[in-house]
A protein has these predicted regions:
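A glycine-rich helix N-cap at a beta->alpha junction
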Residues: 273-296, 300
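Short glycine/threonine-rich loop-to-helix capping motif typified by GTGT followed
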Residues: 261-273, 305-317
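A generic, well-ordered mixed alpha/beta core segment in the N-terminal half of proteins
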Residues: 74-160
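Soluble metallo-hydrolase cores and metallopeptidase-like ectodomains found primarily
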Residues: 58-64, 69-72, 131, 141-224, ...
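Conserved small/polar residues in nucleotide/adenosyl-binding loops
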Residues: 337-343
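Alpha-helical metal-binding/catalytic segments enriched in His/Glu/Asp
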Residues: 223-261
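Acidic/His- and Gly-rich active-site-bordering loop/insert found
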Residues: 38, 42-89
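N-terminal capping segment at the start of a domain
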Residues: 1-21
Length: 347
């Protein structure tokens, strides 16, 4: 069945996307395969009718767009995010040792349930900045194997564990890397051919090594880590690549740092989208008034996950607006308007 093929394609996509940098690399590969040209923010853009392009920022956010063959009068945008709730390695010397074990100093990144991170195979991925002659370059890295774990105390030493535990990241959740010698060859796990002194900085994130699965009596459900928001990033890319721009510029944006407020230079609250649309406007020979007119007629979908109804906790849900798995697209209208536009834009 076709939906099972698509579901497996999503799971495969998620397994390749182990950090925001890997998400943008994967998106770039898909765009390249479909005839898109990569642009640079620092260079002049030369766009043609029917052209397909994309631009990245910080290697962790990407905006792709299609120029229609004829004149356009609006932008049709779908946006998602590349980051996921996880743990981030802290600092350039993250090793915590006690003479027997080496642990990694980490901090929580984004909103998550902490308990599922215990007692399972975890690994690390992200990027490192290395010396390259008289310059520097960024290199994507992935340990690619079961590397660390966060062990629970045995129940004999923690009889209250099934009564509810408040976990401290700094006390309970520093992952064990290895014995006391582990820090001596840590960097070799990622860049075995690069001298330690040539590795200048790093951004590493934990990821769950357990693969996602399709389950249920009729294979109707799917489970995986990083569904928030790689599910939407995957669906947005698939829909965007299948669409054809006619009378409007189609735009697919995947932003970083949604999980921590979107306030970075590559976040959704940055200038990245606005400046990209301004670049498009100028490269297509349109003036500022035309840009504002086109913007006023544009439409944007912010694509993220929704929480489905939990049958064991009906009291937690609105009595009328309940979401069920496989029930279709969810629209979130709320009075404080953070999630949707006025009703007229939803019709």
């Amino acid at each position: 069945m076709e939906y099972l093929n698509t579901a497996q394609e999503l799971l495969d996509f998620i397994m390749r996307c182990k950090s925001p940098f890997h998400v943008v690399k994967e998106a770039g590969d898909l765009l390249n395969e479909n005839g898109y040209t990569k642009l640079e923010e620092t260079k002049e853009w030369s766009l043609v009718p029917g052209g397909k392009y994309y631009v990245t920022r910080n290697e962790s956010s990407v905006i792709a767009f299609q120029i229609p063959e004829s004149a356009f009068s609006s932008y049709q945008i779908i946006a998602s995010h590349s980051d996921c709730p996880t743990f981030k390695v802290k600092g350039e010397d993250p090793f915590v040792t006690d003479g027997h074990y080496t642990r990694l100093n980490v901090e929580g990144y984004g909103g998550m349930i902490r308990s599922p991170w215990f007692d399972r195979p975890l690994s690390l991925a992200g990027r490192m900045v290395v010396r390259d002659g008289n310059s520097v370059k960024s290199v994507l890295v992935d340990a690619g194997r079961d590397l660390v774990t966060i062990p629970n105390l045995p129940i004999h030493l923690n009889r209250d564990i099934n009564n509810g535990i408040k976990y401290s990241v700094q006390t309970d959740m520093l992952p064990i890397l290895g014995d006391e010698t582990a820090k001596d060859h840590f960097y070799e796990l990622f860049l075995p051919d690069t001298a330690k002194e040539d590795i200048l900085s790093m951004e590493l994130y934990l990821y769950n090594r357990v693969e996602g699965s399709i389950w249920g009596a009729s294979k109707e459900f799917l489970s995986s880590g990083r569904l928030d928001d790689l599910q939407s990033a995957f669906g947005s890319l698939k829909g965007f690549l299948a669409a054809k721009a006619t009378g409007q510029v189609n735009v697919c944006a995947i932003f970083d740092n949604e999980e921590v407020g979107s306030l970075t230079k590559q976040g959704a609250d940055s200038s990245f989208l606005t400046e990209t649309l301004q670049h498009i406007n100028a490269a297509c020979g349109k003036d500022t008034i035309a840009y504002h007119r086109d913007l006023a007629g544009s439409f944007m979908v912010s694509a993220d996950n929704a929480h489905a109804f939990h049958p064991a906790h009906a009291e937690k849900y609105d009595p009328k607006s309940r979401v069920y798995m496989n029930g279709g697209v969810v629209i979130k209208p709320v009075s404080y308007t953070h999630l949707t536009l006025p009703t007229i834009r939803l019709v």
